[in-house]
Amino acid sequence: EAQLGNFKFANGSIYDRLGKSKCRLYQHKSGPLSGKIPQVAAIKNVNFGDVRPLAGFEADLAKSYPFGYTFIEPAYGNILNNSYRAKIYNAIRNSSLWDQSLLVITFDEHGGFYDHVPPPAAIPPGDAFNPKHNKHGFDFSTYGVRVPAVVVSPWIKAGTIDHTLYDHSSVPAALTRLFGKEPLTKRLRDAGIGEGL
């Protein structure tokens, strides 16, 4: 059972579901633990020592790379992010793994811009909902504002634009389906994963 602060993920995390040996975590920062991805401390069987500096990503790809899923926490700010995105893309593109790769670039915020499209209804996750950890009573039955995503792969036709509704649960949903695992929540079970791309 994974936990973040006092909130417990009754169904575990995507790392529990896939298994630690299939996942690799990178972050642009290296050094003291305080600079590491804070949520790592909440993921069962994953710790700060499992987060590797992004500087070693390209060299790791050149070796035998056994990981089916790689999560990269980027730098913050547009200039740094653009540089890191290019570096990550080029590392994957120039590796022997390119022909079997899918690079998904997501954003966790919409940038503060007005969105004329109201958020539609969403399938609530269906996992444990404890009002004690949700003082505003949000039940996750509505999506938030739209955020962009970029999907890059030799398997996707260049210039493809997809208007299908996806959400942040589409990534772990795709992973569970790809690796033949049970979804963590109802939302993951029903999330779009881009099969038509």
List each language-model region with its residue ranges.
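N-terminal pro-sequences and low-complexity stem/linker regions of secreted or lumenal proteins
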Residues: E1-L197
